[in-house]
């Protein structure tokens, strides 16, 4: 009499799953327990569409930048659209922790001189700002003793909660200049020539929340040395506080890793307080939108991207949320950090969405400095 050892359903399913995994490895032409030997090999698997069989969301890939390791988490597969239409697959990576702490963009100028602005008395009325600070609707005057050349700027920064008269006015020869032509003191009044075309008070005080035009976008996609990364994108732009101290992210980045990264098509809504429409960017490295890290869209009629499985599948919530979520927390040296997104807030022209130390959705002025957590795609 023979004894038949029947497998339980659970054991049978486990063994079938293991067998199926072996078959996947065989079909992909790689060994069981696949470990890629190069970034180029990973790229080959992605282009062949085999990456979903070989990798899992949450797997990590490591590269170096200036001999410092950068750990990347796989956060999605075939979620993003490559900029180059000949490719259809993508493997999305996100830094496990901030690689640096970066100002999104500097406070902007108030006025740009299309032609030379002669010495004399002028007045401005910053509007639609803060009732207790810059943009309170009052008219202020000031007198220049030196002309502002064509292409020059008048800078009056201020704050949301302080009397604009607490701040002096500086003039510069252009957006890249840091040498002040002269400093003058404003007073309340309407004497002289009105300068009708001026920047929004939010951006005068705390910078612009336009990602496409931002300084941080230039930094994370540049290979240039410090001092050569940033160039003004608008007439009101001013140099970021890292302009002379930070090299572009690509400077010193592992060349083999960089060669496997392709440009990704992304869209970012513009702040409707002062603008309309949606910007498209095609970059190798980018910041995540709020929808991509599972906090929903800023505007209900514009989708800035599908939530990555890394955030959606392991969230503390079952639907997109703006609350504290441990899966969104990024650490540096053991401490939780704020980190930048790319989405502008709807109600202010300066605020940019970020992730709080609790994983909660937040916002802050572009002139603040927070963690740079970059995303990219092997394509």
Report each predicted region and the residues it spans.
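Short, low-complexity N-terminal tether/leader segments at secretion or assembly junctions of large
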Residues: 1-20
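Collagenous Gly-X-Y triple-helix signature in extracellular proteins
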Residues: 17, 21-379
């Amino acid at each position: 009499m023979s004894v038949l050892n029947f497998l339980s359903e659970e054991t049978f399913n486990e063994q079938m799953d293991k067998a199926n995994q072996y078959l996947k490895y065989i079909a992909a032409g790689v060994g069981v327990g696949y470990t890629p030997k190069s970034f180029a090999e990973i790229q080959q698997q992605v282009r062949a569409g085999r990456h979903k069989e070989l990798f899992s969301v949450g797997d990590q890939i490591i590269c170096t930048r200036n001999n410092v390791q950068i750990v990347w988490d796989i956060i999605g597969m075939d979620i993003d659209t490559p900029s180059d239409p000949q490719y259809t697959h993508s493997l999305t990576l996100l830094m496990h922790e901030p690689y640096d702490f970066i100002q999104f963009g500097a406070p902007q100028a108030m006025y740009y001189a299309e032609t030379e602005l002669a010495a004399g008395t002028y007045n401005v009325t910053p509007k639609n700002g803060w009732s207790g600070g810059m943009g309170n609707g009052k008219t202020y005057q000031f007198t220049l003793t030196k002309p502002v050349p064509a292409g020059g700027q008048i800078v009056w920064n201020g704050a949301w909660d302080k009397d604009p008269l607490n701040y002096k006015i500086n003039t510069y020869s252009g957006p890249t200049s840091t040498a002040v032509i002269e400093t003058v003191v404003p007073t309340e009044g309407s004497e002289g020539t009105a300068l009708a075309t001026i920047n929004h008070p939010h951006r005068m005080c705390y910078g612009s929340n336009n990602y496409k035009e931002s300084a941080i976008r230039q930094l994370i996609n540049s290979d240039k040395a410090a001092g050569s990364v940033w160039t003004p994108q608008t007439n009101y732009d001013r140099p970021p506080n890292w302009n002379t101290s930070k090299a572009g992210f690509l400077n010193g980045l592992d060349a083999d890793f960089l060669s496997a990264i392709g440009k990704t098509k992304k869209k970012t809504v513009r702040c409707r307080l002062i603008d309309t429409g949606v910007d498209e960017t095609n970059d190798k490295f980018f910041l995540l939108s709020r929808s991509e890290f599972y906090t929903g869209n800023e505007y209900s009629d514009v989708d800035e991207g599908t939530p990555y499985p890394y955030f959606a599948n392991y969230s503390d919530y079952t639907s997109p949320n703006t609350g504290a979520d441990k899966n969104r927390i990024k650490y540096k040296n053991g401490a939780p950090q704020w980190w930048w997104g790319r989405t502008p807030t709807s109600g202010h022209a300066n605020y940019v969405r970020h992730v709080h130390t609790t994983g909660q959705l937040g916002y802050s002025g572009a002139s603040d400095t927070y963690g740079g957590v970059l995303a990219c795609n092997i394509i």
